[in-house]
Amino acid sequence: MTSNKIKVLCVDDSALIRDLMSKIIDSQPDMEVVATAPDPLVARDLIKRTNPDVLTLDVEMPRMDGLDFLERLMRLRPMPVLMVSSLTQKGSEITLRALELGAVDFVAKPEMGIREGMLEYTEMIADMIRAAARSRPRAVAKQPPAKDKAPLKAPLLSSEKVIIIGASTGGTEAIRHVLEPLPANSPAVLITQHMPGGFTKSFAERLDKLCRISVKEAVDGERVLPGHAYIAPGDWHMKLARSGANYVIRLDDAPPVNRHRPSVDVLFHSAAQSAGRNAIGVILTGMGRDGAAGLLEMRQAGSYTLAQDEESCVVFGMPREAIVAGAAIDTIALSEIPAALMKRAEASGRAQRV
């Protein structure tokens, strides 16, 4: 008897997490746990026997490190992997490395009340598994650091220009691919990536080591400067605002928008109001529709807007919604976005004050 359900294999050294993930997944009508494993060595045999559609993998495990296993898996049998991580500094750094190696997304285990907390995540975990099952897993080719490559030519423009980016599932690597080639005097970049608190600081620090521009977690009230990228902190909405002739960052903990905080729509809406035609809006890979309405507002305010194309997306959800809404002027491959941003910034000439 064949089943159209998404087949999931859960790998975790915690019996509690294996049990909770099984309960969450088996409660959904369109997915099922076909097996569980306490470590990667057991999982290796179960993958051959059960041929799962999605693997959930604990970041830190005995017998074989989760990262070592993931690296081998993505090299030999690329498949959608959802990481399960702890909310620690070490856990966040390992998780970011896992995303770099090809994991689709991650779930952060609650620090307290794991059983209740995980069950509260039921809808989110189910959505992540559905997105993972539809994703395009790919082995990650080794690339030289961006600083070893020639940078893109910096555009001639005023400090009024600003690049606004929104992303979700698959976004951490997509953002890296966009930022790495940018020259040190690139226009300022503001980024909202769906990510819980505790991970965005590690994400910013990781990017800062790889990029020519400075990358940091955003701070409320700070001035937005060329040559800098600002990542919205987890659990905080980020907005672009005006203070006299300058752009500044505003953070707030208003309720989630589209079930997310930070929300891409919140950032895009603020950019439409504060920067208008001086802004460039970019929507990258991700599930759901967050950002579609805001990108349309940016386009209507005179901003140049673009969406990542389906072929280069891990999950073609947010870009598709933006395209359907008529929000994206152009749709291009991820590899072409950095050059398109610099070309567009220069083509627009000296920025006009709003």
From Swiss-Prot:
The keyword Protein transport does not apply. Residues 7-124 form the Response regulatory domain. InterPro entries: CheB-like (IPR008248), CheB_C (IPR035909), CheY-like_superfamily (IPR011006), Sig_transdc_resp-reg_Me-estase (IPR000673), Sig_transdc_resp-reg_receiver (IPR001789). One of its GO terms (cellular component) is cytoplasm. It is an enzyme of class 3 (hydrolase). It is found in: Cytoplasm. Involved in chemotaxis. Part of a chemotaxis signal transduction system that modulates chemotaxis in response to various stimuli. Catalyzes the demethylation of specific methylglutamate residues introduced into the chemoreceptors (methyl-accepting chemotaxis proteins or MCP) by CheR. Also mediates the irreversible deamidation of specific glutamine residues to glutamic acid. Belongs to the CheB family. Contains a C-terminal catalytic domain, and an N-terminal region which modulates catalytic activity. This is Protein-glutamate methylesterase/protein-glutamine glutaminase. It comes from Chromohalobacter salexigens (strain ATCC BAA-138 / DSM 3043 / CIP 106854 / NCIMB 13768 / 1H11).
